[in-house]
């Protein structure tokens, strides 16, 4: 007798190259057995006609806020993650996130969380620990040793790695970047980087961070390449990455299957002259939209855009500027990992935070037929788990963590839009986290089963 049994489902496990009608037995939060044999459980799920997959892993998202005074989380993005089949996510990306990562992880274990969560040490938290620095200026050499000690302490506390957001903090120069990256490398932990710039500066920005990785021997993950290099640069950039990988450098990249990016209006992304990087004229200001909320629907020209930016730097902007073919080229590359870059703020957001993984399957597998189902599932399970070193995630092997997503292939579809970014997807039937049912028939029934993921 098992605590939980999933019966009659079509098990798809890329890590073991399994695709067959099998039963799954679960005990003590772990997968006990995957077999054709009949099994019985205290709780049973009949998965007839459904796909049984390792739980989806999102290795690039932005975690919910944590209030230290009330010792509570404001679950927004994490609930959306659960509803689209995510069982484990990695926050702290792009160099931004919680100022005290280990304290945040401790709260996850103490209070519970909708999904399992790991954190990178965001660069801004390292800088913030030593003062409120000008983001456009380099840090004085005097602070570097202390910053390295702060990073080491967070890594010792179980953080997955380091993240840098060079575009958001353009004052980051070689010394600061490489000194911190060397600490991550010595700890055998990943470094994720949001590169310095995009558009016609993509190639030089990619070469900059690859050089940093080469000099420090860091494992480099280039963040959301799909939104940084889809302006006529994707083929060249991927060629550069592949060539360095062939030389032995540990380089990976990820992307999301949407043709518009989203970030804060006050960030350096929208500094004066940004459209010139994309070889776009002023008419493209009309392709920039407030994500959602009371200010949604404002139509921009150059003058109104910069006036609005000065008044509302925290507004999230949807930039409908990406080349569809290049996004697809990124997402379908054999080594690409698919991520959401999910971010919600003040009721604003991009639909990727609620729809990325169902969209990948519905659009790329079912509609466009440019990915096989096995390849799509691998990009959101085994590949991210392997990339960040989570051996008990992303697989249905016996002994692995019982994190499982069950979905209907004929129904799975992203429903979130730019007007309704929080709308849950269709077709996600069950989500199992640490051996217990967190979501049933598309509805959350327990949102505290997740625990911290540490390395």
Question: What spans do the regions from the language model cover?
Answer:
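Divalent metal-coordination and catalytic microenvironments
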Residues: 9, 29, 49, 60, ...
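C-terminal cap of metal-dependent C-N hydrolases
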Residues: 9, 328-335, 340-341, 404-453
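Structural signature of the urease/amidohydrolase superfamily beta/alpha-barrel
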Residues: 29, 385, 391-415
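Histidine-centered catalytic micro-motifs
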Residues: 55-66, 166, 191-198
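Divalent-metal coordination cores built from histidine and acidic residues
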Residues: 61, 69-163, 249, 258
């Amino acid at each position: 007798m098992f605590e939980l049994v999933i019966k009659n489902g079509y098990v798809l496990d890329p890590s073991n190259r399994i695709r067959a009608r099998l039963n799954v037995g679960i005990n003590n939060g772990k997968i006990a057995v995957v077999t054709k044999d009949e099994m019985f459980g205290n709780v049973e799920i009949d998965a007839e006609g459904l796909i049984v997959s390792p739980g989806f892993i999102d290795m690039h998202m932005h975690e919910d806020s944590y209030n230290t005074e009330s010792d509570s989380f404001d679950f927004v993005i994490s609930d959306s993650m659960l509803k689209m089949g995510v069982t484990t996510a990695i926050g702290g990306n792009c160099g931004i996130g919680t100022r005290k990562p280990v304290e945040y992880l401790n709260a996850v274990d103490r209070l519970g969380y909708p999904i399992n969560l790991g954190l990178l040490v965001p660069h801004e938290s390292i800088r913030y620990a030593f003062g409120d620095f000008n983001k456009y200026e380099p840090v004085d050499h005097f602070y570097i040793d202390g910053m390295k000690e702060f990073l080491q302490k967070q890594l010792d506390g179980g953080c997955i790695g380091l993240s840098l957001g060079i575009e958001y903090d353009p004052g980051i120069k070689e010394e600061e970047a490489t000194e911190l990256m060397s600490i991550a490398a010595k700890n055998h932990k990943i470094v994720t980087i949001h590169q310095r710039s995009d558009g016609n500066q993509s190639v030089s920005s990619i070469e900059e961070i690859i050089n940093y990785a080469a000099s420090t021997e860091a494992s480099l993950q280039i963040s959301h390449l799909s939104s940084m290099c889809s302006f006529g640069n994707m083929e060249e950039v991927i060629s550069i990455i592949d060539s360095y990988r062939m030389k032995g450098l540990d380089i990976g990249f990820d992307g999301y299957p949407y043709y518009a990016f989203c970030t804060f209006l006050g960030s350096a992304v929208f500094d004066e002259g940004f459209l010139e990087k994309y070889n776009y004229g002023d008419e493209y200001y009309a392709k920039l939209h407030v994500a959602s909320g009371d200010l949604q629907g404002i139509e921009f020209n150059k003058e109104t855009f910069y006036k609005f930016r000065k008044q509302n730097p925290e507004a999230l902007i949807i930039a409908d500027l990406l080349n569809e073919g290049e996004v697809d080229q990124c997402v379908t590359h054999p080594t690409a990992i698919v991520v959401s870059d999910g971010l919600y703020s003040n009721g604003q957001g991009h639909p990727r935070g609620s729809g990325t993984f169902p969209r990948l399957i519905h659009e790329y597998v079912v509609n466009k037929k440019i990915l096989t189902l096995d390849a799509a599932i691998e990009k959101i399970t085994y590949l991210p788990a392997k990339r960040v070193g989570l051996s008990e995630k992303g697989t249905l092997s016996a002994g692995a963590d019982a994190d499982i997503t069950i979905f209907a292939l004929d129904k799975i579809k992203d429903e979130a839009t730019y007007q309704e970014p929080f709308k849950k997807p269709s077709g996600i039937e069950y989500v199992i986290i640490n051996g217990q049912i967190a979501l049933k028939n598309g509805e959350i029934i327990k949102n505290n089963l997740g625990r911290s993921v540490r390395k």
